[in-house]
Amino acid sequence: MEHYFSKDSLTLSKRITFGFDFRGEHFDFVSDNAVFSKNQADRGSLLMISEIIDFLSARGVKDGLFLDFAAGYGLIGVILKRFFPEMDIYFSEINRRALELCQINASAANIPKDHIIESDGISNIGNLDFDYISLNPPIRTGKETVKRLILEAGSKLKNEDSYLFTVIGKKQGAESYAKFLAAEFQSDRLTYDKGFEVRLSSKK
């Protein structure tokens, strides 16, 4: 069965553009069939983005290396670029259709094309390490894959003052993954809202 996390898509392409307002800014994204949350910005990602903005703003952060890990069509990184224009934002994604969309959306945000990386996990990210990483994991891949992605994301944190942001729904096993994150990292809940938990994790 084909999923949005498959490398190639067999579903007929039918691109759309959708727009929405977020924290006083308007955003438009190009999307398509067979990608995650194709018709609208998903609630979990928007909740995590709000928490990231508040976390960075409270600390006076303006720049740094940020990875939108398993980026889909680039929702998280593109929005953050608007609020933190000096942030150096990268994207990684395995699904080629989503990757093409990410290139379009990132280009509209003046993000360089070579910052969008086709990669299964961290396999093609190379020697880059990041100050901040976001992950809304592809839950339907199963726990083994999700845990692998979490660990791989953590391995790309630059140092003990670098942070991994994750969002997982209660119905998707947030409690179980919270225990996993706490076992592997220094991990704390940032917020829980409308069935989604956002956590902040760093190296122990």
Task: Place the predicted regions along the sequence by residue.
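Core SAM-dependent methyltransferase catalytic element
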Residues: 192-204
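Conserved SAM/SAH cofactor-binding pocket of Class I
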Residues: 44-126, 132-135
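Conserved class I S-adenosyl-L-methionine
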Residues: 169-184
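A short SAM/SAH-binding and catalytic strip from SAM-dependent methyltransferases
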Residues: 131-144
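A short glycine-rich, Lys/Arg-flanked "PGG" loop and its adjoining helix->strand segment in the class I
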Residues: 147-160
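N-terminal auxiliary segments of SAM/dcSAM-dependent transferases
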Residues: 1-23, 34-38
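Conserved beta-strand signature within the Rossmann-like core of class I S-adenosyl-L-methionine
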Residues: 161-168
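Short beta->alpha hinge that forms the Motif I/post-I loop of the SAM-binding pocket
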Residues: 93-97, 145, 169
